[in-house]
Amino acid sequence: MELYLNMLSFWYILLATSFFGPSQAVYQAPLSVDESQKVTIEEGFQIFTSKHSPQHSIRIKKQDGSICDAHSAQYTGWLDIGPKHLFFWYFESQNDPENDPLTLWMTGGPGYSSMLGMLEEVGPCLVNEYGNGTKYNPWGWSKKSSMLFVDQPVGVGFSYGDEGHDIPNDSYLAAVDMHRFLQLFISEVFPNKLNSPFHISGESYGGHYIPYLGAQIVRQNKLYPNEPQVQLKSCLIGNGCMSHMHTTFGYWETLCTTNPGVEKPIFNETRCDIMAKNMPRCMKVAEVCRRNPDPAICLSAQSVCDEGITGLYNKESDVKGGRNRFDITTPCQADDICYVQGLHLQNYLNTKLVWDALSPPKEVKEYKFASKNVEHAFGLTSDSMVPSTEEVEFLLSNQIHIMSYQGNLDLACNTAGNLKWMHDIPWKGQAELSSKALVPWKSVLASTGKNETVGRMKEVKIRVTDSATFATRYAFVTVDNAGHMVPQDRPDVAFDLMNRWISGETFV
């Protein structure tokens, strides 16, 4: 989210590489092991080594409910890829762990820990208001799916790299590591999930992470059919930063018009006029950056758009300025991410109780929810300036279902920009999707028990090839009265949305 902050200068948030993606499952404790597996025990961890890639191994241990009352089996550990070490936290489904799907969650940034998504949004437990414990989350996504949370890329959260080794600096490199992680996770550690449907979810810079990881999975499955196959079925992208150009374009509509929850425009006529005048030049230089993604060119384009459009709001998006780019109707409560829950979470994950349970290695000195080093590394490349359009198009053409869901109060990765970007994706369903109007969708609210309108949506189901045996779904779903983190703002609606999607149900 810090990237969000700077980026929302805007470029940064956009590109979220899709790349963490582990699958999960297992119910035995200890984990079951067959004779063909290479497994050792060390300092309380079981260590599984890949038969396909000997330099890859996973350290894993089972957790009880002392640090997170998950209502199901849970495991933590690290994937070791030579000098790189990725931390994960895995929860079996509370419903049917044998048959329910696997869902990976990736928080964005770049540089933000997926523990934010776990302990603030969709995990089975949430950090309490004091930052000294957790409470059960009745709307956690593990009620219907096994959930895997990974701190990625290396250098984020509890993940770390050996001294002297570089950290990944773009979405593709991150996706390569995550794909290997998934292969080892489902083939060696939890082989009973090898054939389970797999979904990739996340938010913000996840708009890059998710498509990149999804594309890596599809390509590697085709190239190496004899290696473990990750059974990717769909991607769920929440307020994704997909394209810097489109996100910036959406600033005017988000700040200068109204929508449910916004009774009058946030900006006055003077500021809206300034943005409108500067928009053509910003779009021109952004297009130059897109076609020539050299870091110097794109940084120059970013400066133009920041000065004339995004900076008019973003420079005031902190505690002092009072504005909140993640929810334009509420004030910023804490610098960097604007939400105090992030600080509570960070405090909790640094307690002795948690460290005794997780057993981080000596290389991990403390937990931080944001990594300046990873943010800086990505910022030196053109990764955040290049939209994830090609990866999304590739996934759709390979029959991977995609849902983009949007909290309408978000500015950082706004609804207006992402809807325009979605219409511009060149694929077989483009014409039909663009021609459709958004229609209301309903959800039964926990507060009233009534089936009420909660947003708008549209969807197409397209047979992408003549030989396709099923239609590929692409859905755009909005949620009113929610900002950048829909599951935090409207947990019951977000759970309903996720459950309908992975079970193949419609929204209207």
UniProtKB/Swiss-Prot annotation:
Q: What is its EC number?
A: 3.4.16.5
Q: Which GO terms describe its cellular component?
A: extracellular region; fungal-type vacuole
Q: What is the lineage of its organism?
A: Eukaryota, Fungi, Dikarya, Ascomycota, Pezizomycotina
Cite the entry's keywords alphabetically: Carboxypeptidase, Disulfide bond, Glycoprotein, Hydrolase, Protease, Secreted, Signal
Gene3D superfamilies xref list: 1.10.287.410, alpha/beta hydrolase (3.40.50.1820)
Residues annotated as signal peptide: 1-25
**Highest taxon listed in the record's lineage:** Eukaryota
Cell location: Secreted
The answer to whether keyword Disulfide bond applies is yes
Disulfide bond residue pairs: C282-C305, C289-C298, C332-C338
The alphabetized list of GO BP terms reads: proteolysis
The family database entries (InterPro entries) matched by this protein are listed as: AB_hydrolase_fold, Peptidase_S10, Ser_caboxypep_ser_AS
Q: Where's the active site on this chain?
A: S204, D410, H484
Q: How is this protein named in the record?
A: Carboxypeptidase Y homolog ARB_05721
The entry's family comment says: Belongs to the peptidase S10 family.
According to the UniProt entry, its GO molecular function terms are:
serine-type carboxypeptidase activity
Q: What is the organism field in this record?
A: Arthroderma benhamiae (strain ATCC MYA-4681 / CBS 112371)
Catalyzed chemical reaction(s)? Release of a C-terminal amino acid with broad specificity
Residues that bind substrate? C413, M485
Q: What is its main location?
A: secreted
Q: Which residues are glycosylated?
A: N132, N169, N268, N451
Described by its record, this protein's role is as follows: Involved in degradation of small peptides.
